[in-house]
């Protein structure tokens, strides 16, 4: 297999659906793989969204759900040295990035939001989550994402102040529109 051409954790053209094609006769293999990938998200931030996406199909795994798992494994094989490392850099600027995808789920039309918080050049917090309710507009989804990341930043800033880690204020949050 050629592992050099996998530059993203999931194929962006593939949209997985819940009830397509035939169910796997034994979904144990799929569940074990996704469970191990879920554990790996503790150190591989780049696969968090992909694993969250694949985890939705644990209870009713179908044949098309296996291909993205193997794609993700091949992506991991491309550069096994990637991970989360704390930089020695003394730049303690706290900044955050957030993004949302409105009505992305083809089955439920629910949206997905995520954020990534950095202290200097080191990742300190991240999250990717499918919303429990349907949003009426993309603006509503973006505001929800901003609310989540600001809540996380308030918590982190209080934690860092308690640990006497000084960082410049105000904290910058980057969000697309």
Predicted regions and their residues:
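Long, low-complexity, charge-biased intrinsically disordered regions
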Residues: 1-177
């Amino acid at each position: 297999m050629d592992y050099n051409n996998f530059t993203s954790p999931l194929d962006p053209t593939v949209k997985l659906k819940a009830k397509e094609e035939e169910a796997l006769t034994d979904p144990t293999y799929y569940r074990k793989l996704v469970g191990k990938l879920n554990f790996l998200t503790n150190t591989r931030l780049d696969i968090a969204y992909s694993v969250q996406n694949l985890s939705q199909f644990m209870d009713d795994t179908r044949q098309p759900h296996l291909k993205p798992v193997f794609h993700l494994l091949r992506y991991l094989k491309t550069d096994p040295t990637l991970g989360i490392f704390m930089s020695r850099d003394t730049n303690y600027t706290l900044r955050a990035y957030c993004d949302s995808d409105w009505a992305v789920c083809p089955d439920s039309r629910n949206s997905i939001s995520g954020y990534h918080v950095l202290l200097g050049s080191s990742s300190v917090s991240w999250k990717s989550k499918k919303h429990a309710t349907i949003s009426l507009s993309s603006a509503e989804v973006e505001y929800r994402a901003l609310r989540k990341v600001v809540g996380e930043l308030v918590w982190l800033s209080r934690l860092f102040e308690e640990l006497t880690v000084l960082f410049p204020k105000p904290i910058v949050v980057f969000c697309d529109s």
